[in-house]
Amino acid sequence: MISSFKRAAVLCALVACGANASAQDFPARPITLVVPFAAGGNNDVSGRIIAQKMGELLGQPVVVDNRAGAAGAIGASAVARARNDGYTLGFLSSGPLATNMSLYKTLPYDSTKDFSPVVKTTTSPSVLVVHPSVPVGNLKELVAYLKGNAGKINYGTSGAGSSPHLSAVLFESLAGVAMTHIPYKGGNQVNTDLLSGQIQLSFSPILEVVPHIQAGKLKAIAVTSATRSSLLPDVPAIAETLPGYEVITWNGVVAPAGTPPEVVARLNKAAVDAVNSPEVKTKLLQLGLEPAPSSPDEFLAFIKSEIGSFAKLVKLAGVEAQ
């Protein structure tokens, strides 16, 4: 009996030592970073910027693998099914990790169970912009104007349940106003019709509209983050007038559930150091993204909070899960 106990103890010790050695040696080969969107977009470009710096810090390449489709679900599912050894990661956004949980009846993954969060990397607010023909100069004037013209102002979005749509729905609810929603199949047509005056208002990604704001073709009213954005420091936050307002998009790195904590910690340090590096910060800001690195626990709590927040907004918007 004693001999059996001794053998078991030795075996357990060897397994533990092997796991520790493996974590200490990590990474011993290239890491794959799955981006669940097509190459060339903001998610892809920012993911590549962070991946390159992480690779330098880790001493092994971090190679981006684009797995686009199904609103990010294909790529997210690939990460969830991968071996939990730290060599397959996902660069996921608020869509696949939070919004999708309310927009789809079934998903091939569960955001809170199938991933080990590594780090939140960036956040990005939208900016509420109006066509110059709308006779307002600030948010209070806009709210008053909308109340006097209920349903007469059209706002465009990239589709029902999209971040711009949910941003508008929360604004309508807190401000007590009503606008007419014009959903498009993509953001490009929204900007085209907004600039021509066919629609009068939108909640747009900052990077897309800054040139038009600077040219006087659009008026920036407020940003959707809880506080002012460093990208548009002179533009107030909606929350300054409507307390409690906040709708942002964000990105982060996740690993498959069950990835060893030591490996997650190693990846977190590399990602945080990468995002905080001056050259990466500059590149991210140029993309309209604000660096916001976190710990793994902070990112997990944030994901859970965002799932709840988006669920309320989707219900408020009356969008039915597909």
Give residue spans per PLM region.
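Hinge/capping helix and adjacent helix->loop/strand transition within the periplasmic-binding protein
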Residues: 54, 81-87, 102-189, 238, ...
